[in-house]
Curated annotation (Swiss-Prot):
General function of this protein: Catalyzes the formation of sulfite from adenosine 5'-phosphosulfate (APS) using thioredoxin as an electron donor.
Subcellular location(s) of the protein: Cytoplasm
Family to which the UniProt record says this protein belongs: Belongs to the PAPS reductase family. CysH subfamily.
Pfam families listed in its UniProt record: PAPS_reduct
Gene transcribed to yield this protein: cysH
Residues reported to bind [4Fe-4S] cluster: 126-127, 209, 212
InterPro entries documented for this protein: APS_reductase (IPR011798), PAPS/APS_Rdtase (IPR004511), PAPS_reduct_dom (IPR002500), Rossmann-like_a/b/a_fold (IPR014729)
Protein name: Adenosine 5'-phosphosulfate reductase
Catalytic activity: [thioredoxin]-disulfide + sulfite + AMP + 2 H(+) = adenosine 5'-phosphosulfate + [thioredoxin]-dithiol
Needed cofactors: [4Fe-4S] cluster
Top EC class, one word: oxidoreductase
Length: 243
């Protein structure tokens, strides 16, 4: 693909949305990733949650740029199973450069400054401190970043394009998996025998921080179980409103 380098300042629309064959094996994901790494080279970062979609993207990225930079927002509140998965990914893809990005405040410092249970009393502020601000720091030196958003995940993600102007981070957000279904994600994982978070086998469709993630037994919503006792549906990385 010969599309020019798209930046936050020159973005007009997604040039790929009606151009790629979404009926191919990866529904356009491989082609988008190939273009992204050829275009942005080292100016693009994959912000990885190590969820199911992440396993698909990591495998595709490793075929295109084996030493790609991947950032995990380590809030210090993740499940041990998530950290175990990261170790397995490092073993399987040893060339990948996986960076564990921590917040400026430790949990103890956050508790002293705000509230010992900030994730419960003000989850938006907690997400800002432990996820959004760290990603702001990471993206300050990048032109674009990759995300595993899928349109079918939730109403707030239903209009996501391959290439998006990201107002939150003043960046370009590349979303290769927008047309994938949850079933296709898991078929890819199983067909390729990829590692994945063991909590998925324990009724956790979506996995984040321990205090804000619950198992789900009666919903087909892939985002169910996140902030289940509140109206909150996003950590804030993919919305423009600030706390």
């Amino acid at each position: 693909m010969s599309i020019e380098r798209i930046t936050y300042d020159n973005f007009q629309n997604d040039p790929f949305i009606n151009e790629l064959d979404i009926n191919d094996e990866t529904k356009g994901a491989y082609e988008i990733l190939k273009w992204a790494y050829q275009t942005y080279e080292n100016d693009i970062v994959y912000s990885c949650s190590f969820g199911a979609e992440s396993m698909v993207l990591i495998d595709l990225i490793s075929q295109i740029k084996p030493d790609a930079q991947i950032v995990f927002l380590d809030t210090d509140l993740h499940f041990q199973e998530t950290y175990d998965l990261i170790d397995r990914v490092k073993d399987k893809y040893p060339q990948l450069r996986i960076k564990m990005k921590k917040p400026e405040l430790t949990l103890e410092e956050q508790g002293e400054k705000y509230n010992p249970a900030l994730w419960k009393n003000d989850p938006n502020q907690c997400c800002y401190i432990r996820k959004i601000k760290p990603l702001e720091d990471v993206l300050s030196g990048a032109v674009a970043w990759i995300s595993g958003l899928r349109r079918a995940q939730s109403p707030t993600r239903a209009h996501t394009n391959f290439i998006n102007k990201d107002e939150r981070f003043k960046s370009i957000k590349v979303c290769p998996l927008i047309y994938w279904t949850e079933e296709e994600v898991w078929s890819y994982i199983r067909d390729k025998d990829l590692p994945y978070n063991e909590l998925h086998d324990q009724n956790y469709p979506s996995i984040g921080c321990i205090p804000c993630t619950s198992p789900v037994f009666d919903s087909n919503d892939s985002r169910a179980g996140r902030w289940s006792n509140s109206s909150k549906t996003e950590c804030g990385l993919h919305v423009t409103d600030k706390p």
